[in-house]
Amino acid sequence: MTGKKRSASSSRWLHEHFSDKYVQQAQKKGLRSRAWFKLDEIQQSDKLFKPGMTVVDLGAAPGGWSQYVVTQIGGKGRIIACDLLPMDPIVGVDFLQGDFRDELVMKALLERVGDSKVQVVMSDMAPNMSGTPAVDIPRAMYLVELALEMCRDVLAPGGSFVVKVFQGEGFDEYLREIRSLFTKVKVRKPDSSRARSREVYIVATGRK
């Protein structure tokens, strides 16, 4: 911390983080992040992943979701993952490092998907948070709109979409947009999601 004292809020966050039971379980199990548990809860209720599927993972680093999905889709399945940050390799995951908002990165990602029939698009993307909702929510909504655009481009009929969304301005409109594209849409707040967080997960199945 370059010799400076931590702020009260950052110290509180660190204490909360390391005393979090899901963080502790992730460390014990050798998991990459507590996000593994969120996706496990969603899978238990919605049964999105099956052996042999092709899955796109947006905002993948450090790899918690990809690490989980590999256990569900098996050796014949395939994950195409993307993140601005680096990610250590995972067997069965084709990782592209780059900014998903960049047109060239989007093009490279689509090339990796190729002619594959994608059964699930999942997005855990989030912007760097400033703590100011008027700034953070529009940035977050832009990312989830891009994720939905990816669904339009690559998701097979009958496919599924799971996306982290921060509740706030634009949320209801985005939910309506998803409902127009999928036959069944649920809003989930996993137990492993921190209670005070604005995040929820939209789980949409049955791409029209």
Curated annotation (Swiss-Prot):
It is an enzyme of class 2 (transferase). Keywords: Cytoplasm, Methyltransferase, rRNA processing, S-adenosyl-L-methionine, Transferase. GO terms for cellular component: cytoplasm. S-adenosyl-L-methionine binds at G63, W65, D83, D99, D124. It is found in: Cytoplasm. GO terms for molecular function: rRNA (uridine-2'-O-)-methyltransferase activity. It comes from the Bacteria. This is Ribosomal RNA large subunit methyltransferase E. It comes from Salmonella paratyphi C (strain RKS4594).
